[in-house]
């Protein structure tokens, strides 16, 4: 069983799907409440300390929304979006009975605590979920990199990369290859060499250099998060040394990465 974990969430988890099935926009109170209950229920009764980094793609994507804008400014807007998401998730999790703290890399004392590493660890030790917002305080870095950085700073055992309808990493795109197989175990260097889509290169390099494991899994498969927190193997595990590999070939689980 893990002692302390960092859960990386997509901002789109708060929006729900659009009518055409594509990723939605904004924050849906109902969808956010469902996500908060899912996380809270999985955590209840365990002794696992949980920190969360959430993206802001449901509110702002610099490459799309910031065309013609200074790149740093576009990134700062996106970082503010992650704070909005963090506050929405905090409200929903506390309504579900889970004490939380939002800590931001950009100081905004009226709405959240400034990020201080030792204080974040103390919150975790007291059983509070810590939600990190505002990226790492600097432009040109993704929330994947923020998740890796915060995980290393707080001494997390693993980064859990939560996905929706994606149950792990495949050896090829299952949307194009019906014989695609899910890889249960990989090393960091194999992810780099095979150009598998797990996280951005900066984040992956940090994990590889520091030996930080990554798990890619489907958050919305019932029971998955609880099983992970209890130490079971779920999804794809990426670590420094490869364990005996098991390949999954289940047509019902062929979902795109």
Swiss-Prot record:
Pathway where this protein functions: Pyrimidine metabolism; CTP biosynthesis via de novo pathway; UDP from UMP (UMPK route): step 1/1
In terms of HAMAP family, this protein maps to:
PyrH_B
Q: Which InterPro entries match?
A: AceGlu_kinase-like_sf (IPR036393), Asp/Glu/Uridylate_kinase (IPR001048), Uridylate_kinase (IPR011817), Uridylate_kinase_bac (IPR015963)
Q: What is its EC number?
A: 2.7.4.22
Subcellular location(s): the record lists: Cytoplasm
What is this protein's name? Uridylate kinase
Record-level Gene Ontology MF annotations = ATP binding; UMP kinase activity
Entry GO CC: cytoplasm
Which residues of this UniProt protein bind ATP? 8-11, 57, 61, 164, 170, 173
């Amino acid at each position: 069983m893990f002692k302390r974990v960092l859960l990386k969430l997509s901002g789109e988890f708060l929006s729900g799907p659009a009518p055409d099935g594509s990723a939605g926009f904004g924050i849906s109170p109902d969808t956010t409440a469902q996500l908060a209950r899912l996380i809270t229920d999985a955590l209840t009764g365990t002794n696992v300390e949980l920190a969360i980094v959430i993206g802001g793609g449901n509110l702002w994507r610099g490459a799309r929304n910031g065309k013609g804008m200074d790149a740093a400014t576009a990134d700062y807007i996106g970082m503010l979006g992650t704070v909005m998401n963090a506050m929405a998730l905090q409200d929903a999790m506390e309504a579900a009975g889970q004490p939380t703290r939002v800590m931001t890399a950009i100081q905004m004392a009226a709405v959240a605590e400034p990020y201080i590493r030792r204080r974040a660890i103390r919150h975790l030790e007291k059983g509070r979920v810590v939600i990190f917002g505002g990226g790492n305080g600097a432009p040109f870095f993704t929330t994947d990199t923020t998740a890796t950085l915060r995980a290393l700073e707080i001494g997390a055992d693993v980064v859990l990369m939560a996905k929706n309808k994606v149950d792990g990493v495949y050896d090829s795109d299952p949307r194009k290859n019906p014989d695609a197989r899910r890889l249960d175990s990989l090393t960091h260097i194999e992810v780099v060499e095979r150009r598998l889509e797990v996280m951005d290169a900066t984040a992956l390099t940090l994990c590889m250099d520091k030996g930080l494991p990554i798990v890619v899994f489907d958050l919305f498969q019932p029971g998955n998060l609880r099983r992970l927190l209890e130490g079971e193997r779920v999804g794809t595990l990426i670590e420094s040394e490869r364990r005996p590999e098991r390949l999954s070939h289940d047509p019902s689980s062929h979902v795109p990465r």
